[in-house]
Regions:
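Short, charged N-terminal beta->alpha structural module
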Residues: 8-40
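Conserved strand-to-helix beginnings and helix N-cap segments that scaffold or border functional pockets
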Residues: 24-27, 75-76, 107-108
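Ser/Thr/Gly-rich flexible loops in soluble cytosolic domains mediating phosphotransfer, phosphorylation
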Residues: 84-123
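Short acidic, S/G/P-rich loop/turn micro-motifs used as interaction or catalytic elements
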Residues: 19-23, 69-73, 102
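Eukaryotic N-terminal targeting leaders
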Residues: 1-11, 120-123
Length: 123
């Protein structure tokens, strides 16, 4: 069976990151590393909290990741906005990176952290 067939249905991902190039690069690494288990399509990045509602409404993502530059309170606000836009029962899965992870431990730590938590998030 080809790897793509084993990966299951695609998950549409929206990231919320003020550095869109970095988001694309790091998520690209996760997508590549996990492609035998999951099909993840990075549909969009949102660079500002004020843009979350419009992008989530347009993209209707399955996954929403908030980056480590957001405080826990900001990440909660982003998640609440996203869930408030989607229809009841949509089943949006969210993941917030710990604040400061990128700055303190670098991009490899971000990729590792996502890859460690993705299986339980998608279970």
């Amino acid at each position: 069976m080809p790897a793509a067939a084993a990966a299951g249905p695609p998950y549409k991902l929206v990231t919320v990151n003020t550095a869109p190039e970095r988001a694309a690069r790091l998520i690209g690494r996760v997508v590549e590393d996990m492609k035998d288990r999951y099909t993840i399509v990075h549909a969009a990045n949102v660079a500002a909290i004020e843009e979350v509602e419009a992008v989530v409404r347009e993209q209707q993502p399955d996954l929403l990741f908030t980056a480590s530059m957001w405080t826990p309170e900001e990440a909660q606000k982003i998640v609440a906005i996203a869930k408030g836009v989607l229809p009841v029962g949509h089943g949006l899965k969210t993941f917030s990176l710990p604040q400061g992870l990128q700055v303190e431990r670098g991009p490899d730590a971000v990729v590792e952290h996502i890859e460690e938590h993705l299986p339980s998030l998608l279970a």
